[in-house]
From Swiss-Prot:
The lineage of its organism: Bacteria, Pseudomonadati, Pseudomonadota, Betaproteobacteria, Neisseriales. Its EC number is 1.4.4.2. PANTHER family: GLYCINE DEHYDROGENASE (DECARBOXYLATING), GLYCINE DEHYDROGENASE, DECARBOXYLATING. One of its GO terms (biological process) is glycine decarboxylation via glycine cleavage system. It is an enzyme of class 1 (oxidoreductase). This is Glycine dehydrogenase (decarboxylating). The glycine cleavage system catalyzes the degradation of glycine. The P protein binds the alpha-amino group of glycine through its pyridoxal phosphate cofactor; CO(2) is released and the remaining methylamine moiety is then transferred to the lipoamide cofactor of the H protein. Belongs to the GcvP family. The glycine cleavage system is composed of four proteins: P, T, L and H. Its cofactor is pyridoxal 5'-phosphate. It comes from Neisseria gonorrhoeae (strain NCCP11945).
Amino acid sequence: MKLSELFNPNEFAARHLSFGDEAALLAAVGEKSMDDFVGNTLPQSIRMPSELDLPEALTEADALAKLKGIASKNVINKSYIGLGYYPTRVPNVILRNVLENPGWYTAYTPYQAEIAQGRLEALLNFQQVCIDLTGFPVAGASLLDEATAAAEAMAMAHRVGKVKSERFFVDARVYPQTLDVMKTRAKYFGFELVVSDFAQADEGEYFGALFQYVGKDGDVQDLQDVIGRLKAKGTIVAVAADIMSLVLLKSPAELGADIALGNTQRFGVPMGFGGPHAAYFAFKDEFKRSAPGRIIGVSKDASGKPALRMALSTREQHIRREKATSNICTAQALLTNLAGMYAVYHGPKGVKRIANRIHTLASVFADALVSDGLKVVHEVFFDTVTVDFGSKEKADQVFAAALESGYNLRRVNNTQVAAAFHETSVYEDLADLYRAFTGKDTFTFADDVKGRLNAELLRQDDILQHPVYNSYHTEHEMLRYLKKLEDRDLAMNRSMISLGSCTMKLNATAEMLPITWTEFSDIHPYAPEAQTAGYRELLADMENSLKAITGFDAISFQPNSGAQGEYSGMLAIRRYQEAQGEAHRNICLIPKSAHGTNPATAAMLGLKVVVVDTDEHGNVNIDDLKAKAEQHRDALSAIMITYPSTHGVYEEGIRDICRIIHENGGQVYMDGANLNAQIGIMQPAEVGADVLHMNLHKTFCIPHGGGGPGMGPIGLKAHLAPFAPGHTLTDTHSASAGQTSVAAAAFGSASILPITWMYLTMMGKQGMEQATRWALLNANYVAKRLSEDYPILYTGKNGRIAHECIVDLRPLKAESGITETDIAKRLMDYGFHAPTVSFPVAGTLMIEPTESESKAELDRFIAALKSIRREVQKVIDGEWPKDDNPLVNAPHTAADITGEWAHPYSREEAVFPLPFVREHKFWPFVNRVDDVYGDRNLVCSCPPMENYED
């Protein structure tokens, strides 16, 4: 054996892919080699002119060691900066059994409720926490961050309000990052933001108002009177409230507000250089059909038992399309679960103890400073002590002394410095900070402390009284509760999830390990730049890789979801055209097959959507595109196009599409949802795209987390780069530094970027190209095998598809009465999550197997769908009645087969339809959920405990 053969830097690619299956898969699709297969699948006109310019792969061990070296360049000071981000303690039982558990982080958004009851219960727990703390009857299952939530509240206020005004009031005490995002959104909604002292809010006519509770500099104001005066005028009032402070303070609902929002980060989610974190959003009942994001509701299943589901989906962007005022899809489910479980584990007494300790430490510190003659700016505060030193020189000295002692403070202005206390603050911190603020080594802190919150501000009602917050306070009980919920969900640690357009690929353990390293997780997003050298190097590495992959000139990492990436890309186009004196360009062409976020995003930017027809092959109708581009030539802003198409085909006319748009004065936005079918074989910038968003949670291995987090960075051509999101508090060292932002943190959900860095580093240039080839091969193998039983709706060159295929169930439905939903639910009995149902074509399933699945797993999935086809035939032949068969009754639970049985099919046919199912049976926890009942009888709070027990 040669010495070089002892070391294989490409070992990870062999873990991510199944090289041993290559010959069999190629033979099944009628090809002799992978090169021949790709050549017969991909149009020659779009092939990359050169190979991928990425480094060679590193082994798992070497990649982890290299990343550890990069991470070590970050400096972990004790953070007292505040501004919505605080050090917290993640309970270890939650860290290990949720955040680090593939049973939680590899699941998808709970569209298939019957196999997501555990996650849905966890999300419902979160909603109940928000309901209890805000005082409102309805809360959603998270938004992307506090700044985005504030912008969503502004849009919702305009939608539901009665005041005929385009002016929105913003409390001057609002976090600067929140105001920055609101400025971005307000401009294209046509709103005027008026920023002023909170007490002056009722001096004008506003359709809505936003107050900060607690203020950015720490003060707590009694907002009840000013809110009352605004309400008398019909203004919709939102309150951005610190989640931990609400444990002690009156709820926003009691203050008279209509909407409450904020960040739940300090409920056990690391700061992570800005994210990901789950924002909460709660509101009055009458606004429930106008609220953004997901809402979990209690319904019932076919047997009449309680069951959970995502409620009121008809108000969401994928239904409302260009009529939507929000493009939010899934948000931050995994972080939502962390925050909700934090409340479950600590319970009401625990969270009160934590909140009281934070407030008491801040009060002790303030009292000591006052007794030493210093001026504490605010008499009433929760956690943040702001001191005015009267001179810039003294403030500089204090700030520097704290920094030298390992503490990051916030510089409020030239003379003021603030220290924000938090869950991890300890007695030694008081001593160190006192020394930095006063220059004295001797100190005495009072043992009996009077808090700084006035009695009239304090909460009088009880919180977290539901049994779920009062039952799991020992670790073994919490561990079992988490395991119980996990076992009710089907995630990728059980079987493949073939959701089309979702790219549910392997989330390798080595990729996940670094996200909990303290060097990445414990950094404040506004920490001094000198302390974030590791993150900056990570970002630079990734920017170079993504530029090489896509062909673009610049990358912005700020968008913290795919929908935000869409918005940011189209925003860059709008800003560019305005800078060119072409603000009048307001027409956006969108193919009929586009995802619902596309028209929703266009509408949010003040664009008028013009739909472009598709032809009989599912491709963009070039003639219709050309006619509409020329018709709107003087007003054409952009086209939003997905490639490969949403129909799973490489459209050969993509260069012509881009050329037609450019010739008529427009820009090309490419939706990167299907980028997994491009890497190493084509580049979006090279075929004509001007901007692209990339789903790191699809193509680049960040897990879907059961509904988030995601990341949607954008790649831009040089002319658009100056118009990407900037940031008001962080120097991004980019051409777009002066622009307003789209997210609260400059680099979005930065702490999950190490996942993608590890994937790129371990795969290397050869592995990344192989991944694309295998994604195509697996998809074509599945399509070929299934075409024996089902029509494949669209194909491209040589009858091939790209990375996903659409199975047409409409003929079968017409003949048998069995619906696409019946087949989706029946797959659960075989142990599989359904593919994407009725998108982009009603009555179909869209299947994307990804490159990660082995032939053995693909064959099991194919066998399940073939078996289901035989079951449908039994209905057609009259062997089973149309109203009583295993498809319409699916899914079947353990309770079904142990109870009375009067069906014309056997128990074995119901739950063990194929031999492989016996080896690893997944039992759905509930029967088919009644969606109509759930929407007509919306309950989005935790039901009584006996419902769980039954």
